[in-house]
Design a protein with these regions (language model features):
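Bacterial N-terminal signal peptides that target proteins for export
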Residues: 1-8
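N-terminal signal peptide c-region/cleavage motif recognized by signal peptidases
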Residues: 15-17
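Coil-to-beta-strand transition motifs
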Residues: 22, 37, 47-53, 174-176, ...
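Short, His- and charge-rich active-site/binding loops that engage polyanionic ligands
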Residues: 34-96
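Domain-level detector of nuclease and nuclease-like folds
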Residues: 79-234
Length: 234
């Protein structure tokens, strides 16, 4: 099953309800550091103070009925080099703190939910994307997990070198667009791939589904190689 899923990820055309966008690849010279978190893994772009790639798995046992813990705030990650992204960098900017690995994917365990509220797992998103398009994609992935499928998930940010924008004193990079994939090894035909623009129009996840080949070709080489290598151990 794994080989079938991998072939879907990097070659076979699947979901085709597509609105064409042109994602911009992060400059290949950007430096990434690996940060192991409880039940998810971050590749953090230290040039943009923003996650380049987050990977995690999702099964029915990860899902429960816990909600965001009362008073839970986003915490600065001491594992990141200075200047570290802070929650205050987002204040009154019009951007939301968008989870890449969502807390709801760990709703069976309050401690694991809390672990997702770290700034190395957060990127600036327009509210429409964060609360609608991206949130719908997350719900779709959880619906597959509730149906007893094991899902392998990746999400990350694209930046354009000719339109760099930053937030706050920590200079948190504002992504031009985001990628997300939900890979289902036991039923590859259910796998879904998304390329989302970071704007106010990203309100329907189905509009931004793409083929696996379009997804793979949009990624920077460094990120694509990381995903391929991680998939072998998943």
């Amino acid at each position: 099953m794994k080989s079938r899923g991998l072939s879907l990820l990097f070659g076979l055309m699947i979901c085709t309800s597509v609105q064409a966008i042109s994602p911009c690849r992060t400059d290949e010279s950007d430096s990434l550091i690996r940060l192991q978190k409880p039940r998810f893994l971050v590749y953090y772009n230290i040039n943009r103070n923003c996650p380049a790639l987050v990977v995690w798995s999702l099964t029915k046992t990860d899902l429960g009925h816990h909600r965001r813990p009362a008073g839970q705030s986003f915490l600065t990650d001491p594992a990141c080099p200075r200047p570290r992204a802070k929650s205050s960098d987002f204040t009154r900017t019009g951007f939301q703190r968008g989870h890449l690995c969502p807390s709801a994917d760990r709703s069976a365990n309050v401690g694991l939910m809390r672990a997702t509220f770290v700034m190395s797992n957060v990127a600036p998103m327009y509210p429409e994307l964060n609360m609608q398009g991206f949130a719908q994609a997350e719900e779709h992935s959880r619906s597959l997990a509730w149906a007893n499928h094991r899902c392998l998930l990746v999400a990350g940010a694209f930046f354009s070198s000719d339109s760099l924008r930053y937030l706050g004193k920590s200079s948190v990079g504002i992504p031009d667009s985001f990628f997300r994939a939900c890979i289902v090894p036991d039923a590859p035909e259910l796998s879904v791939y998304w390329l989302f623009p970071n704007d106010t129009k990203a309100t329907r996840e189905a509009t931004f589904r793409v083929s696996s080949s379009a997804f793979a070709s949009s990624l920077r080489r460094k990120v694509l190689d990381i995903i391929k290598e991680l998939y072998k151990s998943w």
